[in-house]
Amino acid sequence: MCGRNQLFVASLLASACLIYCVQYVTVFYGVPVWRNASIPLFCATKNRDTWGTIQCLPDNDDYQEIALNVTEAFDAWNNTVTEQAVEDVWSLFETSIKPCVKLTPLCVAMRCNSTTAKNTTSTPTTTTTANTTIGENSSCIRTDNCTGLGEEEMVDCQFNMTGLERDKKKLYNETWYSKDVVCESNDTKKEKTCYMNHCNTSVITESCDKHYWDTMRFRYCAPPGFALLRCNDTNYSGFEPNCSKVVAATCTRMMETQTSTWFGFNGTRAENRTYIYWHGRDNRTIISLNKFYNLTVHCKRPGNKTVVPITLMSGLVFHSQPINRRPRQAWCWFKGEWKEAMKEVKLTLAKHPRYKGTNDTEKIRFIAPGERSDPEVAYMWTNCRGEFLYCNMTWFLNWVENRTNQTQHNYVPCHIKQIINTWHKVGKNVYLPPREGQLTCNSTVTSIIANIDGGENQTNITFSAEVAELYRLELGDYKLIEVTPIGFAPTPVKRYSSAPVRNKRGVFVLGFLGFLTTAGAAMGAASLTLSAQSRTLLAGIVQQQQQLLDVVKRQQEMLRLTVWGTKNLQARVTAIEKYLKDQAQLNSWGCAFRQVCHTTVPWVNDTLTPDWNNMTWQEWEQRIRNLEANISESLEQAQIQQEKNMYELQKLNSWDVFGNWFDLTSWIKYIQYGVYIVVGIIVLRIVIYVVQMLSRLRKGYRPVFSSPPAYFQQIHIHKDREQPAREETEEDVGNSVGDNWWPWPIRYIHFLIRQLIRLLNRLYNICRDLLSRSFQTLQLISQSLRRALTAVRDWLRFNTAYLQYGGEWIQEAFRAFARATGETLTNAWRGFWGTLGQIGRGILAVPRRIRQGAEIALL
C-alpha cells in the first residue's frame, strides 16, 4: 500500500514537472550582441585636395569611444578593416597617377649615349672606407655635395618614329634615367642600343599628370547599425584571442596614406615605447618605433629641372625633360637617435613572447634584402612629392650596426625612376612624368617593416617591402562588428495575450554606442533595460544616418557621386535595411515591435540553459549560435500555425453576432448545407435499403435470380391457407400465403416506387415540421422581443418621468436656497452696516463726550 502511494505521488510530481518545468523559447530584442562583419566602411578626411575629397567625406571630429567589460579576439592580418585600408589607399594612389596613354609605340630600339656635364665636372663616388655623420648645420646639406654623392646617371637617346605624317619617319631625342632603360650588354660602342624598361614584360602607361601622389590623413567610420571595436591592451601584438580591454567606437583614429618600403612614415601609432606586431603564422612583423628618439628622414632632389611635352603622333604627347647638364643625385639623410632606437628594437624583440632566437642583442642585426630582388625590395622605395626614390641603404645599415670596416654615413644616395612597379598589383607599370624644380620632403619615421629570421646563433631582421603591413599597424587593433540585437533564451513563460504595457522612457546615453554599454553586464540585468536599449539602438542609428547625411550634403558639389560617393550614400541606407530586416524577422515569429516576446515553441535542449546572473549575452550567443537556424525555423512554423488557428477562430467569432445570421451570403450557405444534408440522407437511405434487400435475397425471401427473366408462371397453384406446412419447409422457402401471382420483377419495381413515395412523404413531413417549428420559434422570439421592447419603453418612460420630477425638485430646491441665501446675506449686510454706523457714531461722539466731561469737571 505504501509503495502504491509513493508511485502515485511520484506520478503527480512528474506530471506537475511536465506542466510547469517546460522551458519555452523567448525572443529578446535589444540585447548587446554582435558578430564580425565585412561591409564597406566610409572614410572621412580633413584634406581639401580635389581628388582626396572626392574619395572621402569631410571630417567633423565628432567621434566617441566607450569602454566595454567584455573579452574579444583581434587579428591584424585577418581583418576586414586593414584589408579595406590597403584597397582604398591603392585606389587613392591609382587615382593620383591615373594612366591615360599607353606607351607601346615607345618600345622601339633607341641609340643612347651617357650624358656628360657641359659646365661642370662630375664628382666621382668615393670607394674608400669613411665615417661621416652630418647634422642640420652641415654645409653639404645646402650644397648637396656630401661625401660619396655624385650625379644622376642619365642617357640621351635618339629614335625614329612615324609622327603626324604617317608616310614619313621623324627623328626624336629623349633623355632617360639610366635605371629606366635596358641596353644590350654585347654592344661595346660608345653609342648603345637600348629599349625602354619593361617593354617585353608588361604594358606601360603614362600618368595623366593632373596631380601627384601626396600623402593625406583620413579615418574610417562604420555605417549606422555597425560599430568598431578596438583592443586597448598594452601588450597587444597583432594577434590576441582574448583581449580584455575593449572599447567601442564609431570611427578609427586618423591614419596616413603611406606608400613606402622598409620604413613607415608619419604614422599615428607611435608611442613612448617600442612594440612589435607579429603575424600569427609566419615571421612577418611590423615594428613601431619609440617616438622619444625623434627619428626623421629628409630627402631632396637637387637642381632646377624643367619638363617639356613631345608630340610623337596624333593623340600621344610624351612628357620628358631636356638635358642642360647632369643633375645632382637625389639623397636622404636620417636625423635622430637612430642607434639607440635600433638597440631598443633588438631588446624588445628579445623579450617578445613569439621570439625563439638568441637573446644576445649583439647577435641580432639588421640586414638588407637580396640584391637580386625587385628594386622596390632591394632599395628603400619612397615618394617625394611625385618623384619615386630608390635609396641604397648600405651606408645607413653600416652606420646603425657600427660596421667599422665599411663606409658609414647617416645619409644614403637615391636614384629616381619614372617607370615604377605598382606596389599592390603585380605586372603593372606606370611612367610618371618628371616634376619641375627642386624637391624636398621631410617625414617622421614611425615603424619598420621586417621579417624576423631567428636562430640560436644569430637573428636577422630583414627589411621588407610589404606596404600593406603599414596599415596593419595603423588599424590592426580595430575590428568591424555588426550589431545583432535579436537573442534567444529559454524561460518557463509560455506565450499569452495581454494589453501592451507602456514602459518609462530611458535616457539616451552616447547615442548608438550607448546601446553597447550593457555588453559586459549579466543577461538578467541587461534584459531589464531592453525597452530603453531598443529605443537607444534605433535613435542611435537615426543619429548616425543624420550625421552622415549632413557631411554628404556639405560635400555634394565635390562628391559628384563617384564610386566612393556611391558607397557613402549606400552606407546611409544600410542601417534602415538592417532595421527593417530585423523587424521583418521578428514579424515572421509574431514578435514585431516587442522587446520580450514569449512563444509556444519548447526549448530545443533542456541541458543548455543560461546563467542569468553571471553570463553575458555575447557569451550566451556564442553557445547557441549553432541552434539559431533550427530555433528560427521552429518559430516560423509555430507562427504559421498560430495564424491558421486565429483565422479559424475569427470564422467562429462571426457566429456570435446576431446580425450575421440574417446575412444573404450566410443564408445561401445554409441552403447549400441543407441540400447537401438532404442528398446525403437520400443516398444513405438508398444504400441502407440496397444492403437490406441483398441480405433478404441471400436468405431466400425473394425468388431466385437464376430463373429466366422471360419466365411467367402459367398455372397458379392455390394452397390451402389452413393447411400446415412442415416447419423445415416454412423455414427454407418462407410463407407463401397471399395472392403472390405477379412476376417478381414487376412486384419489385412497385415495391421500390412505394418506398420512394414513402421516403418523399417522410422528407416532406420533416421539412414541414422544421418550417412550422422555425415559424413557431420565430413567433416566440418576436413576442419576446415585443415584450422586451415594451418593458424597455415603459422603463424609459418611468425613468424619464422620475428624472423630470427630480429635476423640477432640484430646481425648486435651488430657488429656495437662492432665496434663503439672499435673505441671509441681506440681513447680514444690514447688521454689518448698522454695527459700522454705531462704531462710527461712537468714534464721532468721543470729542463731544470729552468736552462734556471737561465742562462738568470745571463746574
Swiss-Prot record:
Protein name, per record: Envelope glycoprotein gp160
Motif (Di-leucine internalization motif): 858-859
Cysteine disulfide links: C43-C56, C100-C208, C107-C199, C112-C157, C221-C251, C231-C243, C299-C332, C384-C441, C391-C414
Lipidation residue positions, type S-palmitoyl cysteine: C767
Region ranges (V4): 391-414
Motif (YXXV motif): 701-704
Keywords: AIDS, Apoptosis, Clathrin-mediated endocytosis of virus by host, Cleavage on pair of basic residues, Coiled coil, Disulfide bond, Fusion of virus membrane with host endosomal membrane, Fusion of virus membrane with host membrane, Glycoprotein, Host cell membrane, Host endosome, Host membrane, Host-virus interaction, Inhibition of host innate immune response by virus, Inhibition of host tetherin by virus, Lipoprotein, Membrane, Palmitate, Signal, Transmembrane, Transmembrane helix, Viral attachment to host cell, Viral envelope protein, Viral immunoevasion, Viral penetration into host cytoplasm, Virion, Virus endocytosis by host, Virus entry into host cell
Extracellular side: 25-673
PTM remark: Specific enzymatic cleavages in vivo yield mature proteins. Envelope glycoproteins are synthesized as an inactive precursor that is heavily N-glycosylated and processed likely by host cell furin in the Golgi to yield the mature SU and TM proteins. The cleavage site between SU and TM requires the minimal sequence [KR]-X-[KR]-R. Palmitoylation of the transmembrane protein and of Env polyprotein (prior to its proteolytic cleavage) is essential for their association with host cell membrane lipid rafts. Palmitoylation is therefore required for envelope trafficking to classical lipid rafts, but not for viral replication.
Region (Fusion peptide): 506-526
Site keyed Cleavage: positions: R505, G506
InterPro entries: Gp120_core_sf (IPR036377), GP41-like (IPR000328), HIV1_Gp120 (IPR000777)
Signal peptide: 1-24
UniProt lineage: Viruses, Riboviria, Pararnavirae, Artverviricota, Revtraviricetes
